[in-house]
Structure formats: structure tokens, C-alpha cells
Amino acid sequence: MAEKTEKPTAKKLRDAAKKGQTFKARDIVALIVIATGALAAPALVDLTRIAAEFVRIASTGAQPNPGAYAFAWAKLFLRIAAPFVLLCAAAGALPSLVQSRFTLAVESIRFDLTALDPVKGMKRLFSWRSAKDAVKALLYVGVFALTVRVFADLYHADVFGLFRARPALLGHMWIVLTVRLVLLFLLCALPVLILDAAVEYFLYHRELKMDKHEVKQEYKESEGNHEIKSKRREIHQELLSEEIKANVEQSDFIVANPTHIAIGVYVNPDIVPIPFVSVRETNARALAVIRHAEACGVPVVRNVALARSIYRNSPRRYSFVSHDDIDGVMRVLIWLGEVEAANRGGPPPETRAPTSAEPQARDGVAPPGDACADNAFPDDAPPGAAAPNAGSPDSPAPDGGAPARTGDQNA
């Protein structure tokens, strides 16, 4: 059998609480009840009313009716005792509910024949809890002896003075001395109560300890199999990446920073002439966006200032490019249009070197062909459309066309 070395989990504690196995410091609850009763007794137990009832009965000359006499005493007892009993019951119920975390032990109400098992009874008889209770009983005997000694030293004059007290004050003095004796006993027993609660808490968690196999099995039951959940996460990530890939393929160009930020820009003049952000990724996802764009022939422009500005001014994906960044985006689109016209072999536009705000062509030719058919430009593509591979406007094209390149930052 595996050794139980693991602490009980939250689910284990909840299941045990439903079975009635909760941490119970019964002596602390008893201390609260006794202290509440001792403090409330002088205020709730009205001896004057009891004495007045005796005087009333004695003053009647005729023989009282036994039934009416018993009913009157019952009413008086309820008026005096009912508030006292209810207060003590509430003082005992509230700490018990707090200890059980307001969990109702429904399963403990059922009739369980295993509680009559003599083997389990012998185990309980020679358990650590039984040894703890035996030691606690001996400590309480010592506490009671100490309480009597201290009480005798403090209040012996008041006790012997009862012989000379007036009869009307005897009841009140007895109540006061009794309350003092009870409170003194509780004060002397407080260290034993705290020690008992600590040992009880230790034994409670010791009984509910679990082995590693139980912890793993409970995790599988509550959270699901780890391998299945990992596969689900991978599938979910693949679904998300497919959406991002589609956005990359439909973008006019990707502006990078150069490895930490990737911003996709899409323009559809038929709908609205303002460009908007189609992709907005950082770090590892930004690198993946750049690789996928290069594989699909989507121009990748490396412009640190523009990428950072768009990332800062456009905090959400599918939002329009801010007014401060439109000029830089339009410069890139114009430059890409010039590159596309040169690649198609048409009449080249007025060639010029890109300004500092425009990207420069980086060395290295992108893979030939278009890996994403949806992004291939037809022969009648408008001049403002983005090129599948961006090149430098100064690069001549062999056989009437310019090689496709990706842009790089010059600033």
C-alpha cells in the first residue's frame, strides 16, 4: 500500500465535509457556550420574579389549584429559561457552523452499519485520538485543582461571608461567585483548549492525507485527462492560427519591427479608402506571421518606426489605421504599386529612390511563385493593389520583370 504523504486537496476536504468529517474543536465550542451562559445568567435569570411568585402563593389564604399552580410555574420557567437556552444554543451552533464552513453533512444522517463494526471500534479505542483524549482528561483534572486553589485564595472571604449575608442577597451572591468560578476555570483551561485544538487539527489532516496516485486520479476525474486536454489545446491553437493565416494571406502587406511586432495592413477602396489593421501580433507570433507572409508572397516591409507607431496607435485588430500613420502606410502602398508595375513588365512609373519614410529592398529574392493562390494578382489588377512580393524599384527585372523582394527599413 502506498504511503499517504500528500496533503488533502480541496475536493477531498469538501467530500469529507459532506460525510461529516470536518475539523471540530469541541472543547472550544463548549468553552464559548459555558462563557456565554455564565455571562448571561445574571442578566436573564431574574431571581426577584421567582421570589415574588413565592410571596404571591404564600399570601393566598385558600389552597391553590394544583393545575393552575403548575401552569403558572411553567409559564414563569419558560419566560426565564427560554431566552437563556436559546442564547446558549446559538453560541454553540455558530462556532460549529464556522468550523464546518457552513457545510451540511447530509450523508452522515444516513444509517451506516459499518459504525457497528467491532474491528473499527477497536481501532478507534487504540488510536491517536483516544490517547489524546486520555491525556486531555488528566490535564483537565489538574486544571480543576488549580482553579479551586486560586478561587479559594481570591474569594475565601466572600464565601465565608455568606453566613452573615441577608437572605435577600444570598441568591445574587451565589450567582456572582459561581460565574467567577466558571470564568476562572475557563481561563486556567485555555492553554489546554488551544493545545487540544492544534492536535485535533493535525489528526484531522493526518486522517485525510492522500497518496500520489489518489491525487493524480482525482485530478483526472475533476480536470480531465492531461493528454486529452493537451490535444484539445493544440487543436484550439491550430484553429486560431488558421484564422491568423487567413488574415495574413488577405493583407496587402506586413510591416515588421523586425522580429517583435508584425502588423498586417489591408485596404479595400471599394468599401472604404482608409486602411485598417488585419493582423496584430508580437514576439513568437510575429515571427510566425512574417514566415507565413514570405511563404505566401505577401510583402514584408521592415520599418521599425511605422510598425511601432501603428501598434501603439491601433490597439485592436480590425481597427482603422490612425490619422498619424496614414501617410506612412500610403507611402508603402505607392512604393509597392511601383514594384508591381515593374514586375508585370508594363510601362514603369517615374522611378525614384524611396525616401527615409519608405522601405528599402532587402537582399535576397523571395521564393518564386505564389504559395497562396488567393493573393495572386491578376493581369488587370489595379495600380494601387499590393504586390505579392515587394522589391526595390531600382532592381531591373530579367525577361521583362523584376525579381520579387521583401522590403527592409532604411531609417
Swiss-Prot record:
Coiled-coil stretches: none
Compositional bias ranges of the Low complexity kind: 370-404
Entry keyword set: Cell membrane, Membrane, Transmembrane, Transmembrane helix, Virulence
GO CC annotation: plasma membrane
Transmembrane helix keyword on record: yes
Disulphide-bridged cysteine pairs: none
Transmembrane parts of this sequence: 28-48, 80-100, 137-157, 175-195
Broad class of where this protein is predominantly found: membrane
Topological relation to the membrane, as annotated: Multi-pass membrane protein
UniProt region (Disordered), positions on chain: 341-411
Domain of life according to the entry: Bacteria
GO terms, biological process: protein secretion
Cited PANTHER family: FLAGELLAR BIOSYNTHETIC PROTEIN FLHB (PTHR30531), SURFACE PRESENTATION OF ANTIGENS PROTEIN SPAS (PTHR30531:SF14)
Protein's job: Part of the bsa type III secretion system, is involved in the intracellular replication of invading bacteria inside the host cell. Probably necessary for the lysis of the vacuole membrane and escape into the host cell cytoplasm.
Similarity remark: Belongs to the type III secretion exporter family.
Name of the protein in question: Secretion apparatus protein BsaZ
Gene: bsaZ
